[in-house]
Amino acid sequence: GESKLAGEKSIAEAGIPYLILRTSWIYSLQGKSFLRTIKKLASENDMLRIVDDQIGAPTWARSIALATHKILEQYLRNKTEPSLSGIFHLTCQGQSSWHGFAKEILSLSDASQNTKLLPIPTSDYPTPAVRPIYSLLSNDKSEKAFAFKMPHWHDALKDCISSTPT
């Protein structure tokens, strides 16, 4: 987190137009992601302990890619427009806990429907990196500047699970 912030500050202080896109809770059908991990673990276990007190917006990588394409088209056409320069957030609409996200993944996929999900507090799941309890980002500035809305995370997850990995 600190190195990302330092990089953002350096870019902002350069005195030229810039575009920084922030996102969070990214998942995909490819690579290492919470979605793939939950599906795999559900196929191997009868019960999963999932953190239920961290809140964020699950965001499909494809949703980010599509939004980034729209943003770049507008930015490149209007680079000198001050409202299109700066830091912008790109996360799906809505919010969930990791437990809620896992529950939705299993309900929409062919993963084991018999796997029980046990909600646990963050304190019961220590990790090397400290994770914020509340990590929602507001898309208001992005929506106003670039005139678009990110999809709701439920809708993006349905589309992701029903899509074929490319």
Predicted regions and their residues:
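Residues that recognize and position ribonucleotide moieties
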Residues: 19, 48, 57, 94, ...
